[in-house]
């Protein structure tokens, strides 16, 4: 297996921390064990066989190299697998184990420092993080597109959509109710702990959990879309959209769930969705909790807007600004973060 030479480059402390995370096998185990994710990429590549036959592919953030292997199986003649972490050494072994050394070249480099000797016909990348934008890998894909992708070349996936919906969270409800139940268990009244528990649970940190379809309180709204063929670096640094919901019925509103879908190009296009209405993925859903739960009724209107942007402290981390109004009431604002 040939390892392409790379020029020296500087990495930020945040980049080093990010790439080090991907040297841990558990990260790759979780991703590859996610059959919804992995099969979507495999199927999308195979369905683009006619477009990839004899072509050159760039795999951005190749990890273990599985997408590079899929690309060759789909007919690619040459694949450049760019991986900045030490996992690149294992990607070489994966490629060799599948007898693809003559077609897949692994480059241990960030994509911004990679030296790729030719233009490519397609780019494949699994760049999505929690709430789509956590870890901020999409700018690297755009960089690769602008530098190496031939005019009219393929990007897999080619578009992304973000969704939001109001939700009830039974786990949060149960945890808050627990403190009112302690007296019945031990004869000690600890209901005063409930407000403290609420401030700890419903804080400014985004949570990643599964949401049951029955806990979604209104039809979801798509609040942002990206066309990866044309979107700019500036556009992906500040994703913004508005929402308006009409609640299905009487319930406690604990917050909002955010999820995404990505779609691959082709006549028989493949969509990978992280919706609570679909099969479970390792991304689950991202939850934005209010400061306290609010009672809503049938047809209660909820309006507002949401903005996703990189953290000022660490651009790999995510910041979400939420503005909302419930039942025509006071407009409230809450800022969330993901990452320390």
Swiss-Prot record:
Keywords, alphabetical: Chromatin regulator, DNA damage, DNA repair, Methylation, Methyltransferase, Nucleus, Repressor, S-adenosyl-L-methionine, Transcription, Transcription regulation, Transferase
Pfam families, A to Z: PrmA, PRMT_C
Keyword Phosphoprotein: no
Gene name per UniProt: prmt6
Protein's recorded name: Protein arginine N-methyltransferase 6
GO biological process, one term: methylation
Enzyme class: transferase
Catalysis: reaction(s): L-arginyl-[protein] + 2 S-adenosyl-L-methionine = N(omega),N(omega)-dimethyl-L-arginyl-[protein] + 2 S-adenosyl-L-homocysteine + 2 H(+)
Task performed by this protein: Arginine methyltransferase that can catalyze the formation of both omega-N monomethylarginine (MMA) and asymmetrical dimethylarginine (aDMA), with a strong preference for the formation of aDMA. Preferentially methylates arginyl residues present in a glycine and arginine-rich domain and displays preference for monomethylated substrates. Specifically mediates the asymmetric dimethylation of histone H3 'Arg-2' to form H3R2me2a. H3R2me2a represents a specific tag for epigenetic transcriptional repression and is mutually exclusive with methylation on histone H3 'Lys-4' (H3K4me2 and H3K4me3).
MF (Gene Ontology): histone binding; histone H2AR3 methyltransferase activity; histone H3R2 methyltransferase activity; histone H4R3 methyltransferase activity; histone methyltransferase activity; protein-arginine N-methyltransferase activity; protein-arginine omega-N asymmetric methyltransferase activity; protein-arginine omega-N monomethyltransferase activity
Family, per entry: Belongs to the class I-like SAM-binding methyltransferase superfamily. Protein arginine N-methyltransferase family. PRMT6 subfamily.
Active site: 126, 135
InterPro entries named in the record: Arg_MeTrfase, PRMT_dom, SAM-dependent_MTases_sf
EC number, as in UniProt: 2.1.1.319
Binding site for S-adenosyl-L-methionine: 28, 37, 61, 83, 112
Annotated SAM-dependent MTase PRMT-type domain residues: 15-321
PROSITE patterns noted in UniProt: SAM_MT_PRMT
Key word Ion transport present: no
GO cellular component assignments: nucleus
């Amino acid at each position: 297996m040939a390892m392409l030479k790379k020029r020296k480059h500087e990495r930020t402390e945040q980049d080093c921390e990010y790439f080090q995370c991907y040297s841990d096998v558990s990260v790759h185990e979780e991703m590859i064990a996610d059959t919804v994710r992995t099969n979507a990429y495999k199927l999308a590549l195979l369905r683009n066989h006619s477009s990839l036959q004899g072509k050159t592919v760039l795999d951005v953030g190749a990890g273990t190299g599985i997408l590079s292997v899929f690309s060759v199986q789909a007919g690619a003649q040459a694949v450049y697998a760019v991986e900045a972490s030490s996992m690149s050494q294992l990607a070489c072994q994966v490629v060799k184990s599948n007898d693809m050394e003559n077609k897949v070249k692994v480059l241990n480099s960030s994509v911004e420092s990679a030296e790729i000797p030719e233009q490519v016909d397609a780019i494949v990348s699994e760049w999505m993080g929690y709430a789509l934008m956590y870890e901020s890998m999409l700018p690297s894909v755009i960089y690769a597109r602008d530098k190496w992708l031939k005019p009219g070349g393929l990007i897999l996936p080619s578009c992304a959509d973000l969704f939001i919906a109001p939700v009830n969270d039974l786990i949060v409800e149960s945890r808050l109710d627990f403190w009112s139940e302690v007296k019945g268990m031990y004869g000690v009244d600890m209901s005063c702990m409930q407000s403290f528990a609420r401030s700890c649970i419903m804080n400014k940190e985004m949570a990643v959990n599964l949401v049951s379809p029955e806990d979604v309180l209104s039809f979801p709204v798509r609040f942002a879309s990206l066309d990866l063929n044309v979107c700019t670096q500036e556009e992906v640094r500040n994703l913004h959209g508005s929402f308006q919901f009409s609640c299905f019925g009487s319930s406690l509103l604990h917050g909002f769930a955010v999820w995404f879908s990505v779609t691959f190009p082709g006549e028989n296009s493949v969509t990978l969705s992280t919706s609570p209405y679909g099969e479970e993925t390792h991304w689950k859903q991202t939850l934005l909790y209010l400061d306290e739960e609010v009672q809503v009724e049938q047809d209660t209107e909820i309006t507002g807007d949401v903005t996703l942007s990189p953290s000022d402290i660490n651009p790999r981390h995510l910041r979400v600004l939420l503005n909302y109004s419930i039942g025509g009431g006071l407009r409230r604002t809450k800022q969330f973060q993901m990452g320390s």
